[in-house]
Design a protein with these regions (language model features):
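Hydrophobic, Leu/Ile/Phe/Ala-enriched alpha-helical segments that form helix-helix packing faces
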Residues: 15, 75, 79-82, 134, ...
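Adenosine ribonucleotide-centric catalytic and binding domains
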Residues: 41-52, 115, 126-130
Length: 146
């Protein structure tokens, strides 16, 4: 399974140019105050994540923001379904740098142990709330699956 990070602009370009990759599931982060990208013409495996791009600097802030990330368990199930179906995953957010990078890092760390490399890549600033919530949900899902 390949995990890609993509911005809204690049994703919209792929849809317009009809260059959307086959066997691909999408995790689409968007600000709740905006409309999400419509993937219905190019992809049926999409998980929409309405979540503000807020980073945190303390454990208290993390707990406060994690309450808003109430879809982590469903997202973990979606990710495992894509993994089991041998699909690639595109993690997309507005700029392709924070929420999508945090999600991609969690997926790569969980399945391959390579997600922390995204934290050292200057192209990304992974959202820690997204990373920890997705990673923890994937671990819990794997435990339940056994």
């Amino acid at each position: 399974m390949n995990v890609l990070i993509c911005s809204r602009k690049d994703m919209e370009k792929m849809i317009i140019n009809k260059s959307f990759p086959q066997k691909t599931a999408v995790i689409s982060f968007y600000d709740p105050s905006t409309e999400h990208i419509k993937f219905d013409r190019v992809c049926c495996d999409v998980y929409y994540c309405p979540f503000e791009d807020i980073d945190v600097w303390s454990a208290a802030e993390f707990e406060e923001q994690s309450v808003q990330f109430d879809f982590a368990d469903d997202l973990a199930e979606f990710i495992y379904k894509a993994y089991d179906n041998d699909q690639n995953i595109i993690c997309q957010c507005d700029h392709g740098q924070s929420r999508s990078a945090g999600c991609a890092a969690a997926i790569l760390q969980h399945f391959y142990g390579s997600g922390l490399a995204i934290f050292t890549d200057y192209n990304y600033c992974p959202n820690k709330v997204v990373y920890h919530n997705v990673y923890n949900a994937l671990r819990a899902y794997r435990s339940e699956k056994k």
